[in-house]
């Protein structure tokens, strides 16, 4: 199967940060670790990101910014970059999705989708 020139594989894992949360104040904080891999055939640089964060009440926040954690990773084909960040929502359950904006070495801009993933506190048995 022939690879596409402009393609970024994105995987995300989220965990609840109990020590940084304040349920009594409706603040639930989650860390998420993103692993991105250039699965295309052309080197590319990450320019920006767009996140859509939604809580269980349907409140949606859009976060748009340059780079990720202060960096603009440059990825050759087959190279990966990983980072961890955090988000706080007002409910114990929510979700995030979005996209990364990149520019390939040949000048072609492209967007890589970030599939929706859950933000959820672990269930407890009493």
From Swiss-Prot:
SUPFAM superfamilies: ApaG-like. InterPro entries: ApaG-like, ApaG_domain, ApaG_sf, Uncharacterised_ApaG. Residues 2-126 form the ApaG domain. Pfam families: DUF525 (PF04379). This is Protein ApaG. It comes from Methylococcus capsulatus (strain ATCC 33009 / NCIMB 11132 / Bath). The gene is apaG.
């Amino acid at each position: 199967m022939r690879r596409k020139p402009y393609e970024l594989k994105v995987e995300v894992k989220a965990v609840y940060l109990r020590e940084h949360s304040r349920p009594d104040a409706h603040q639930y904080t989650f860390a998420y670790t993103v692993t991105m891999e250039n699965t295309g055939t052309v080197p590319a640089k990450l320019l920006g990101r767009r996140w859509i964060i939604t809580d269980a009440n349907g409140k949606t926040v859009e976060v748009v910014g340059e780079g990720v954690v202060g960096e603009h990773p440059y990825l050759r084909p087959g190279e990966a970059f990983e980072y961890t960040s955090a988000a706080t929502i007002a409910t114990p359950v929510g979700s995030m999705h979005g996209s990364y904006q990149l520019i390939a070495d040949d000048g072609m801009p492209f967007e890589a989708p970030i599939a929706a993933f859950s933000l959820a506190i672990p269930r407890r048995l009493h």
